[in-house]
């Protein structure tokens, strides 16, 4: 019984560690999704402003420079590690939206994995409770026989 409880505790701890790792990954995905959504909003805002409007562009964390919006028909988009591609404006928006969809799909997979781990934890707890109840019943039966 004691070894069985220890094994169950270790399994529960392992599942909880996996859940924490998956939650951390979801947090990173959420940050990336937020960044991509902000990029979409910024591109759309710049397009709405139109050519010739003045905007402030950040240069590092403490400086900004004034620039005029020129043509918004081309956008340079990161398509991989240190690789960028020049895309048409609408194509760039679609590319970013597709990336968001992929990340949301992956996020859903991680959430499902977390739900499965919680189900495994619940199964282990139920198993431990059942074992405990069976042992109590066995002890009571042995006590009755001893009397």
UniProtKB/Swiss-Prot annotation:
Compartments in which it is found: Cytoplasm
Gene Ontology molecular function, alphabetical: unfolded protein binding
InterPro entries membership: PFD_alpha_archaea, Prefoldin, Prefoldin_subunit_alpha
Major localisation: cytoplasm
Pfam family, one: Prefoldin
Alphabetical list of HAMAP family matching this protein: PfdA
PANTHER family given in the database record: PREFOLDIN SUBUNIT 5, PREFOLDIN SUBUNIT ALPHA 2
Subunit note: Heterohexamer of two alpha and four beta subunits.
Function: Molecular chaperone capable of stabilizing a range of proteins. Seems to fulfill an ATP-independent, HSP70-like function in archaeal de novo protein folding.
Record's protein name: Prefoldin subunit alpha 2
Native source species: Methanocaldococcus jannaschii (strain ATCC 43067 / DSM 2661 / JAL-1 / JCM 10045 / NBRC 100440) (Methanococcus jannaschii)
């Amino acid at each position: 019984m004691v070894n069985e409880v220890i094994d169950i505790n270790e399994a529960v701890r392992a599942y909880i560690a996996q859940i924490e790792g998956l939650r951390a990954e979801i947090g990173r995905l959420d940050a990336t999704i937020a960044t991509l959504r902000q990029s979409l909003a910024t591109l759309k805002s710049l397009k709405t402003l139109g050519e010739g409007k003045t905007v402030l562009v950040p240069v590092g964390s403490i400086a900004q420079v004034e620039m005029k919006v020129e043509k918004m028909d081309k956008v340079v988009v990161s398509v991989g590690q240190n690789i960028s591609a020049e895309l048409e404006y609408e194509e760039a928006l679609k590319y970013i939206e597709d990336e968001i969809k992929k990340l949301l799909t992956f996020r859903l997979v991680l959430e499902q994995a977390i739900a499965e781990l919680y189900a495994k934890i619940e199964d282990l707890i139920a198993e431990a409770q059942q074992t405990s109840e069976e042992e109590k019943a066995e002890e009571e039966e042995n006590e009755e026989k001893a009397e």
